Amino acid sequence: LDKTATGSELFNFIATMIKEIITEGEHYYLGHTFSFPFTQTNIDEAYLIEWTKEFKTKAVEGQNVTALLVTALNKLGIFNVEPVAVINDTVATFLAAAYTNNNVIIGSICGTGHNTACLIGDTIFNLESGNFSKIPLNKYDEQFDLLTEKPKKQLLEKLSAGRYLGEVVRTV
């Protein structure tokens, strides 16, 4: 499965992986992370705003990713997996740390992508900090950025995350 797969292919792949680990006759409540910018309208609803990390999967932007997953699960005859929550990975990291330390105020991911969540008052905010773009670029950064799917977007992520670092070095 590559990053240009259709939305159906992507969620069918995820559903197939889930099918491999579940037991028929048992009921599963599923909490899942989605590591892309989304608008959350309910604990189990997340509408993809736009792809990052060079994903090009069609027919997903603007869609409820949990509903797409349920459709894929049902297509495979899987009715015993019930998605009950979807969360951004930085928020999940924040909550995991805060579970044992109530002084935590930041959750951060620097892996394939880059993002940060922070606590302001009683609310955890997903900052989508990988999209921070007011940073100085050298000529190599500028050359590399022009080779990406979305130039001038996700600059901090492009200059710091694992998805891009090898390619940055290769183009220098």
Identify the role of each PLM range.
Residues G25-S35, V84:
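Short glycine-rich phosphate-binding loop at a beta-alpha junction
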Residues E26-Y28, N80, N88, C110-T112:
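Short, basic and Ser/Thr-rich N-terminal targeting/leader segments
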Residues L1, E20, L30, Q40, ...:
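Gly/Thr-rich phosphate-binding beta-strand-loop-beta motif of the actin/hexokinase/Hsp70
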Residues T16, E20, T71, K75, ...:
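Ordered, helix-dominated protein-protein interaction surfaces in large eukaryotic regulatory proteins
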Residues F94, A98-C110, H114-V172:
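Active-site core segments that coordinate phosphate-bearing ligands/cofactors
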